[in-house]
Amino acid sequence: SQRDMFNDEVIAQFSQLRYSELVKQIRLAQQPEKVTLKFDFDKNAPCVWLNQQPIDFKDRKLDFAFYAMMARSKNIEEDPIERPTTESSKALVSSAFYRELALLANITMSWGKDEVDFLEKLEDADILETRTVKSLMTQQNDGSTGVNVSFFDTRKNNLYKYLKQKLPQALANLIMPISE
């Protein structure tokens, strides 16, 4: 039944919606071809528009940038971004993630020799917290910095949990850009 698509937490969250709006959510999950996503890169209030419904990411900027990176990769890039398990994949994922963070902060994307400066600009723009900058700058065993497997997995898990809080699980599964 359609009721089975919602857990109690989701029903409680959607209690402010009319029943007809709730049914629209269920039907949307059953018609993936009708799902559209639009990313709004407002640094003060980023959100993802799922058809006409906003999903607020104001307090989840890292998750927003991660989501944008993965969705963009899935939809337009020839080599979709995957879990960064090698030095080259870490560099690819870091570059793509930094690109989304730069778009969100509305700053020029520059790093490489100036990776520390770039990350500090993101911190100054209230996109990154100090602990996140330190995490991205921590050298791994292979000498690389940036997005490592642990950081990637944490972002993926946090994003999925957040989407499940905001949407029926079937719809969250549908719009999650990588398998959980």
Language-model-detected regions and their locations in the chain:
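Intrinsically disordered, low-complexity acidic/Q/S/K-rich activation/interaction tracts characteristic
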Residues: 1-2
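Short boundary/linker motifs that mark transitions into or out of structured domains
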Residues: 5-81, 85
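Detector for Asparagine
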Residues: 7, 44, 51, 75, ...
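Extended aliphatic helical segments
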Residues: 10, 23, 35, 48, ...
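DNA-binding patch around the recognition helix
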Residues: 27-32, 77, 119-128, 143, ...
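Short, charged/polar micro-motifs that form catalytic or ligand-binding hotspots
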Residues: 52-60, 142-153
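Short amphipathic alpha-helical recognition elements used for nucleic-acid or partner binding
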Residues: 55-140, 159
